[in-house]
Regions:
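A glycine-rich beta-to-alpha transition motif near the start of alpha/beta enzyme domains, typified by
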Residues: 1-110, 149-277
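Active-site glycine-rich loop that binds ribose-phosphate moieties when present
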Residues: 119-138, 165-167
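Internal active-site segments that recognize and position negatively charged phosphoryl groups
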Residues: 130-132, 136-158
């Protein structure tokens, strides 16, 4: 079976072209392929499938084989993959609905992709959470994936894996399915974000839907945007573990964030042939 490996801001994925429907993988097989010690290794696996309404369908799985959610970095990577497969338009369906994208720059194997995300209609502010080791102030939002966002000082030294795992598993307000947990520290000109990812159960180099959630929570919390435009749109520059991304949206009275766009890198890494048991 042929896979292609792509990474978006260090968030890496195995992708297969399944427009003919021939790729059928079990949860255990996906987890085995994504295992970094005994498999190929990736944060997630995606299938590019045919769609009756749009140019293609994105099917996303976490590294543990769970699915049913949107992945922002994965969305940019599957657009880059679709372009490499010869597609010229990028209207597609995902677990959370319709998306569109544009490739706005390319240098070598790296593309810069601008991806339209879902509108975010509301949020929940929790002054504290109920559960062991979960007494933390933060915001819950759904950006295609469930996210909890915390503002913390000293982000570089912060133990986000321990606290992220506690919140993901123990916070009663987020159960029964839990949530990704994001930690933010504003800086002059933007925000820095680190994310504990549910399904990976560890920190990843970046999380696209988490970065979107973090930018919207920053707006709600009064963090000054990096840019403000005449049409009312605002933008935030974001630093992940190593790469920089950008989010822009229109805040409105009716919903929190409308016409949301995530811009960042998507890079081809390798082609891989795998025998599946």
């Amino acid at each position: 079976m042929k896979f292609y490996k792509y990474q978006g801001a260090g968030n890496d994925f195995l992708i297969a072209d399944n427009r003919d429907g021939s790729v059928q993988l079990t949860t255990a097989q996906i987890a085995a392929l994504c295992d970094r010690r005994y498999g190929v290794g990736a944060d997630g696996l995606m299938l590019l499938e045919s769609s009756q309404e749009y140019d293609f369908r994105m099917v996303y799985y976490n590294s543990d084989g769970s699915g049913g959610m949107m992945c922002g970095n994965g969305g940019r990577c599957i657009v880059a993959f679709a372009a490499d497969m010869g597609l010229n338009h990028f209207d597609f369906e995902a677990a959370d609905g319709f998306h569109t994208a544009q490739i706005i720059a390319q240098e070598g194997m790296a593309k810069t992709v601008r991806l339209k995300m879902k509108d975010v209609e509301g949020y929940e502010h929790h002054s504290s959470l109920t559960g062991p080791n979960c007494a933390s102030d933060g915001y819950f939002l759904d950006t295609g994936t469930r996210h909890y966002v915390r503002f913390v000082p000293g982000l570089d030294a912060y133990d986000i894996v321990t606290e992220g795992r506690d919140i993901r598993y123990n916070a009663e307000e987020l159960q029964p399915v839990g949530a990704y947990v994001n930690f933010i520290e504003p800086y002059e000109g933007g925000i820095r974000v680190r994310t504990y990812e549910k399904g990976v159960e560890d920190e990843t180099f970046a999380c696209g839907t988490g970065i979107v959630a973090s930018c919207i929570a920053s707006y709600v919390n009064g963090v000054r945007p990096s840019q403000a435009f005449e049409d009312g749109r605002i933008g935030y520059d974001v630093k992940a573990k190593r790469d920089s991304l950008a989010v822009d949206f229109i805040p409105t009275d009716e919903i929190v964030a409308q016409d949301v766009w995530l811009t960042g890198p998507a890079t081809y890494v390798a082609q891989i042939l795998v025998e599946i048991d």
